[in-house]
């Protein structure tokens, strides 16, 4: 069983929803990312999602676009992020790590080489925003060999037939996009998200995690009862952008994640975490 599957099983046994924070790898620097990953875990993260910076992150809003620019300016490359994960794994062999990126990044390295290097570093899952399952044959083959889960997005307007097709080849968990638009978009409707998650669950036993538009503890808490995981990105990336030079950035990030964790637990476990 993969680290991702183990973690979701543990969360389910504990009666809590998995918290999946996202940060952009290399922002403000690759060295900082190692420290920030440990801070996320200290705050209660169950899975960590790392964005691989790209010069044209079309699915991302201005906050993450700016983070990608900062990371690239700091010299971040996929190879340096693999080293970040290796260093993280020296102290944390258990927390699942998912890379989120764009097809051009993987194509530049070669699908097989990228997956092989990711697995060797300790990456558990890959989410390629702009690579549909029909075009992921070589990537899927190598991911299967290396034991890396391929995670796919399901949008609110995805047809039932398409949802079933995506779920049939997905691994790890299904990423349910809670809003149309880019990351960091505005208001969520928890009722509609709950219906979306229920539709996905009708065709797969994989955990369903919800992201896009989760901005604060209140919105995370609202979604926690209807999903297996809640993904929070832009709010944390914004904090890193505002306080990147602060010596206490890891503590600030830890406390922000802890607030999310407590709010979610209050709605799913009665506050017992």
Curated annotation (Swiss-Prot):
One of its GO terms (cellular component) is cytosol. Its EC number is 4.2.1.20. The active site is at 49 (proton acceptor), 60 (proton acceptor). One of its GO terms (molecular function) is tryptophan synthase activity. Pathway: Amino-acid biosynthesis; L-tryptophan biosynthesis; L-tryptophan from chorismate: step 5/5. CDD domains: Tryptophan_synthase_alpha (cd04724). Keywords: Amino-acid biosynthesis, Aromatic amino acid biosynthesis, Lyase, Tryptophan biosynthesis. It catalyses: (1S,2R)-1-C-(indol-3-yl)glycerol 3-phosphate + L-serine = D-glyceraldehyde 3-phosphate + L-tryptophan + H2O. Pfam families: Trp_syntA. Belongs to the TrpA family. Tetramer of two alpha and two beta chains. NCBIfam families: trpA. The alpha subunit is responsible for the aldol cleavage of indoleglycerol phosphate to indole and glyceraldehyde 3-phosphate. This is Tryptophan synthase alpha chain. It comes from Halorhodospira halophila (strain DSM 244 / SL1). The lineage of its organism: Bacteria, Pseudomonadati, Pseudomonadota, Gammaproteobacteria, Chromatiales. The gene is trpA.
